[in-house]
Amino acid sequence: MSMKISEKKFNDRVGDGIQDSFMRGAVSSAQTRLYTNRLKAADELGNWEEWRELGEEIRQHTLENLDYYLMQLSENVSKRGGHVYFAKTKEEAAKYIQDVAKKKQAKKVVKSKSMVTEEISMNHALEEIGCEVLESDLGEYILQVDNDPPSHIIAPALHKNRTQIRNVFKEKLGYENSDDPYEMTKFVRKQLREKFMDAEIGVTGCNFAVANTGSLCLVTNEGNADLVMSIPKTQIAVMGMERMVPTMEELDVLVGLLCRSAVGQKLTSYVTVAGPIQEEEVDGPEEFHLVVVDNGRSQILGSEFRQVLQCIRCAACVNVCPVYRHVGGHSYGSIYSGPIGAVLTPLLGGYNDYKELPYASSLCGACTEACPVKIPLHDLLLKHRQVIVEQEGRAPLAEKLAMKMFSMGASSAALYKMGSKMAPAAMSPFTSGNRVSKGVGPLKNWTDIREFPAPSKERFRDWYKDHKKGGDK
């Protein structure tokens, strides 16, 4: 899988999402639950805004000194016996991982959940050279079996219910039991455990890399990443170049923010800090590789969008977004969905494929308020819109003409007065009662799904004149 998950046009993807009543119900329920849990966890911590400010400060400091911390990380990983590779492009990253697999003559690879490995199409690259790649995260495993893309950053199978999952397991894996979650989880556990033991290579992502120790931090709810890191003889960790922290002290702050913002917990079930195996350690990989991926991030770092790199992938913005609530994750056409996806995806994938995403927002600002590291997401969405209009001339000719006419009318008192007088008569063939009828010309996309009030026959100026102090009415 790559970052792009659909070839459909944006409007078609949105239409599919709106028509999927189960998905919208599941997303609404999950958003409400995660939002409530996040507020409770934040309240328990106390002075949440101060923690957010500290998180923002840490992320900004790290990005401002990213070259220093990346070199420090590389030196310390190398000192501990690991190998570090800096990949400028996603193709370079995938090729390096292919080369490691070829060198090890690997046939089976097991991996934990990782957005950046999907971004670089790692699974496809390994399958090209004959490797079987197994997802060990339960949600990702379900989607892999069903050949379905993720719809949420931390809950990839959010759009499926247990009956659908049971049917997938029955059709693809021969599962014969009920749709009870416990039974299905037990079935998957047996499937995965057997393959864990046979895998030659384990691949993980990286929530944070600690510069001064050469360590990686992984945060999971299932413990699958621990097995990926400890059973296979070779481990490959893949990280976006921005996922750095200077020391364990900063890591402590960001993990606390991540867990509370993502799922409303003080800590997830498993927080693991590890790296290349040391002489005194009894388990872990014999060989360790760290792949640091740029893939456009250095360009973002030097642009007006650099604040998006503060993201810690908690999905708090996704869990409060009203647009995501109604259209779901697949509508974004990218592995990165929600407000963070609408900002990040056009930067990584370009405006040609993703120029609609910055407009998939009501600009309500809920995402900015929810972000634990204070990324001004709605401001960045507006910046995208500005760039698109200036560079791409996105607006259709009819829209440009309509806006030009409105600008002329709104800036002239005489024209505005004349227009307000003519509007009721001009719209009368299209009105029913006090509302505009459905399917009216260029207003169709609005009037088909929302009530559009008909122009009032009484102008405000006339009403005010009659009702001002001393008036008769």
From Swiss-Prot:
Domain 4Fe-4S ferredoxin-type: 302-332, 351-380
Keywords on record: 4Fe-4S, Electron transport, Iron, Iron-sulfur, Metal-binding, Repeat, Transport
Binding of [4Fe-4S] cluster 1, residues: 311, 314, 317, 371
GO biological process, one term: lactate metabolic process
Keyword Chaperone tagged: no
Domain of life: Bacteria
Gene Ontology molecular function, alphabetical: 4 iron, 4 sulfur cluster binding; metal ion binding
Positions annotated to bind [4Fe-4S] cluster 2: 321, 364, 367
InterPro entries linked to this entry: 4Fe4S_Fe-S-bd (IPR017896), 4Fe4S_Fe_S_CS (IPR017900), FTHF_cligase-like_sf (IPR024185), Helical_ferredxn (IPR009051), LUD_dom (IPR003741), LutB (IPR022825), LutB/LldF (IPR004452), LutB_C (IPR024569)
Family statement: Belongs to the LutB/YkgF family.
Function: Is involved in L-lactate degradation and allows cells to grow with lactate as the sole carbon source. Has probably a role as an electron transporter during oxidation of L-lactate.
Protein name: Lactate utilization protein B
Native organism taxonomy: Bacteria, Bacillati, Bacillota, Bacilli, Bacillales
This protein's encoding gene: lutB
